[in-house]
A protein has these predicted regions:
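Membrane-interface "cap" regions at the ends of multi-pass membrane proteins
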Residues: 1-27, 56-61, 65-78, 82-89, ...
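Membrane-embedded translocation segments of transport machinery
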Residues: 2-6, 167, 171-319, 323, ...
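Helix-loop-helix connectors at the membrane interface of multi-pass transporters/channels
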Residues: 3, 73, 106-138, 242-246, ...
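Inter-helical loop and helix-membrane interface segments of multi-pass membrane transporters/permeases
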Residues: 3-4, 32-36, 71-90, 103-163, ...
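Select transmembrane alpha-helical segments in multipass membrane proteins
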Residues: 5-16, 41-44, 83-96, 145-150, ...
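Transmembrane helix-boundary motif of multi-pass solute transporters/channels
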Residues: 11-48, 234-240, 251-254, 258-259, ...
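Membrane-water interface regions at transmembrane-helix termini and the short interhelical loops
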Residues: 32-36, 83-99, 134-136, 149-173, ...
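C-terminal membrane-solvent junction of multi-pass transporters and transport-like membrane proteins
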Residues: 87-90, 338-349, 380-440
Length: 454
């Protein structure tokens, strides 16, 4: 059966960016930028994005395009008879584990969009808003409902095919996301007192950077640049398999990285002016999204409207990742079993829903279950993906593309450079072969130490 391809280059770029853009762009990147020295952190982050994220992303795209297979089968296609193929199964497992907790978080975004639009938070003080968040976590049935909507809608889109389902929906959703983002950012920057938030966010503050420690800032930027693109589990390789050979792949990797960075930066333009305008502390993680910002919207004129738009923006950001990863899972399972796309979607839909239940139950009925080092179920699942599968998977991609024991540098470079645009240069070989694996391994070790310390 002939492999279905994406209908346009724009579709490929938006799909790949949609996979990279997620809720971490909104609740982590702006906070890190503000705390780690503003514009100084952004410059260091962009440097690491270019020297770390772009090369590995180029490798994933090249492997997918050359093999014209899912991550499950691409190793067998590129290096027949080798043992590299086992990593394809790890990639599939990584995508599944990622969705075991990400669908729950996407469900939270959807629920907060519905609740904000319905006026649930209107008139509540800080304590009341915090109580609402606690009530959501304590209600497994309601969380399962919203998580189920995310799963069913996601697989329904994927069942329509690459062009008619995935590409069509993602293109419109990503364009809506970008429009919403700019509208929200413009409104936030016009708030009285918002300029102080912009100064805190964007102006380089080397004194603040020195207080935190230059080493800590560099490590933070390096980690964020690596993890923002979701490299290492083949989530990007699948899109390489859906495109032609008109464009060189390093240029495409740069464009996807810049799109991802634009959304991350603009999230800060939404959050910091609003928080500073109303004297609200800016913190990281779920507290920022589910407690701090609903409180801010209660003080803004037409806050219910702007809050609804913000949580719609977040829902789109989460759902774009869900669609991309669902496509990867469906393609892998379909190639492994020979099932039709619709049958695969139906079975995967039921499977992902059931596998996602432990995560949401970990906040109520199973709240005493602490699988890894005393961490709850969501954090434990996140650890398996973010701290193990992403860095180790990226290391495997690098070794496969640069050593004679794998696909090899010459074949990788020939595939990556086919077409017009920015190409992999010969002088990059020593860096990508010897330096890049060391950087990724350092990130892996830092992640392990940090997780078990906390």
């Amino acid at each position: 059966m002939q492999r279905e391809h994406l209908g346009s280059r724009l579709g490929f770029l938006l799909l790949s960016a949609g996979c990279a853009i997620g809720i971490g762009n909104v609740w982590k990147f702006p906070w890190m930028t503000g705390q780690y020295g503003g514009g100084a952190f952004v410059l260091i982050y962009l440097l690491f994005l270019l020297v770390l994220g772009v090369p590995v992303l180029t490798m994933e795209f090249a492997m997918g395009r050359a093999a014209q297979k899912s991550p499950l089968k691409m190793y067998q296609q590129l290096k027949p008879g080798s043992k590299w193929g086992w990593h394809g199964y790890v990639c599939l497992l990584g995508n599944i584990v990622l969705m075991m907790f990400y669908t729950t978080v996407a469900g939270w975004m959807l629920q907060y969009f519905v609740d904000t639009a319905a006026g649930v938070f209107v008139g509540l003080d800080t304590a009341g808003i915090e109580t609402k968040f606690g009530e959501m976590l304590a209600n497994p049935a309601k969380m399962a409902l919203y998580m189920g909507v995310v799963v069913v809608v996601g697989f329904s889109v994927i069942s329509l095919g690459v062009q008619k389902g995935l590409e069509r929906v993602t293109k419109w959703m990503m364009m809506a996301l970008i429009l919403l983002m700019w509208v929200l950012a413009f409104h936030s920057m016009t708030l009285s007192g918002g300029s102080r938030g912009l100064s805190f966010y964007l102006i380089p503050d080397f004194r603040r950077m020195a207080e935190i420690g230059v080493g800590n800032v560099v490590v933070g930027a390096m980690n964020q640049a690596f993890f923002t693109l979701s490299l290492g589990i083949g989530a990007m390789a699948i899109f390489g398999s859906y495109i032609g050979k008109d464009h060189a792949l390093m240029g495409e990797a740069v464009r996807v990285s810049l799109l991802d960075t634009m959304v991350a930066l603009c999230s800060g333009l939404i959050i910091f002016p609003a928080c500073f305008a109303y004297g609200v502390d800016v913190n990281s993680g779920p507290a920022l999204i589910f407690m701090t910002l609903p409180n801010v919207f209660n003080h803004i004129a037409l806050g219910r409207f702007w809050g609804s738009l913000f949580f719609l923006f977040l829902t789109f950001a989460a759902f774009s990742t869900v669609l991309a990863v669902f496509e990867n899972i469906v393609c892998c399972v379909s190639e492994m079993t020979g099932w039709s796309r619709k049958k695969t979607c139906l079975i995967c839909c039921a499977g992902i829903f059931l596998l996602s239940l432990p995560c949401l139950l970990g906040y109520n009925l199973w709240q005493n279950v602490r699988p890894i080092a005393g961490h709850d179920i969501l954090d434990s699942e996140d650890f398996l993906v973010s701290n193990l599968m992403l860095p180790l998977g990226s290391l495997i991609f690098i070794l496969f593309c640069t050593t004679r024991y794998g696909w090899g540098w010459e074949k990788f470079m020939r595939e990556a450079n086919e077409g017009t645009g920015l190409k992999v240069a010969k002088w990059m070989r020593p860096y990508m072969t010897y330096v890049l694996p060391v950087i990724v391994f350092v990130i892996f070790v830092i992640g392990l130490v940090g997780f078990f310390k906390t």
